[in-house]
């Protein structure tokens, strides 16, 4: 029996050594794996930016261009029409200014001429002793009529000039393609 006891004792000590070895192994594994949840979180990747294929980008660009291009073309045409109107208006205003300047010059000149003519006639008649108030009034009336006719003539010339300008087709604006 002692032999059995020895063998049983050897078995128990071997089993105890195995249990101790397993406990040490468990402690080592626990120490090695206790940081795994943190490592899992650290090593996980978050998708911050998604990649889009270039074909999708090109397709989106074409779609936007197809939507916006007709609107842009319509606005460009509208702007060109308005610009053409403004150019015609500018030309008309410039011709009006020229006409008004000519009228002012003519009025100033005719006033000087009429005043000097009236003074000359009056001086001559006074010196001759032949003053006729009705003839003097008639002279002033005729001079006023002359001024009105000059004004009407200049207005008609301006209208004729405008009519000729409006029949001339305006050149389309130069476009860079």
UniProtKB/Swiss-Prot annotation:
One of its GO terms (biological process) is mitotic sister chromatid biorientation. It is found in: Nucleus; Cytoplasm, Cytoskeleton, Spindle; Chromosome, Centromere, Kinetochore. GO terms for cellular component: cytoplasm; DASH complex; spindle microtubule. It comes from the Eukaryota. Residues 71-107 form a coiled coil. Keywords: Cell cycle, Cell division, Centromere, Chromosome, Chromosome partition, Coiled coil, Cytoplasm, Cytoskeleton, Kinetochore, Microtubule, Mitosis, Nucleus. The keyword Cell cycle applies. Belongs to the DASH complex SPC19 family. Component of the DASH complex that connects microtubules with kinetochores and couples microtubule depolymerisation to chromosome movement; it is involved in retrieving kinetochores to the spindle poles before their re-orientation on the spindle in early mitosis and allows microtubule depolymerization to pull chromosomes apart and resist detachment during anaphase. Component of the DASH complex consisting of ASK1, DAD1, DAD2, DAD3, DAD4, DAM1, DUO1, HSK3, SPC19 and SPC34, with a stoichiometry of one copy of each subunit per complex. Multiple DASH complexes oligomerize to form a ring that encircles spindle microtubules and organizes the rod-like NDC80 complexes of the outer kinetochore. DASH complex oligomerization strengthens microtubule attachments. On cytoplasmic microtubules, DASH complexes appear to form patches instead of rings. This is DASH complex subunit SPC19. It comes from Debaryomyces hansenii (strain ATCC 36239 / CBS 767 / BCRC 21394 / JCM 1990 / NBRC 0083 / IGC 2968).
């Amino acid at each position: 029996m002692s032999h059995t006891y020895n063998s049983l004792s050897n078995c128990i000590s071997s089993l105890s050594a195995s249990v101790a070895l397993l406990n040490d192994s468990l402690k080592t594994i626990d120490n090695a794996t206790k940081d795994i949840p943190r490592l899992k979180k650290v090593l996980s990747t978050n998708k911050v930016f998604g990649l889009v294929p270039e074909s999708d980008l090109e397709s989106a660009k074409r779609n936007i261009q197809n939507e916006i291009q007709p609107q842009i073309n319509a606005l460009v045409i509208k702007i060109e029409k308005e610009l053409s109107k403004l150019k015609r208006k500018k030309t008309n205003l410039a011709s009006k200014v020229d006409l008004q300047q000519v009228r002012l010059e003519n009025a100033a000149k005719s006033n000087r001429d009429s005043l000097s003519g009236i003074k000359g006639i009056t001086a001559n008649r006074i010196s001759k002793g032949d003053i006729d108030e009705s003839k003097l009034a008639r002279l002033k009336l005729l001079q006023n009529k002359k001024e009105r006719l000059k004004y009407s003539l200049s207005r008609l010339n301006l209208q004729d000039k405008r009519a000729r300008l409006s029949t001339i087709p305006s050149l389309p604006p130069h476009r860079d393609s």
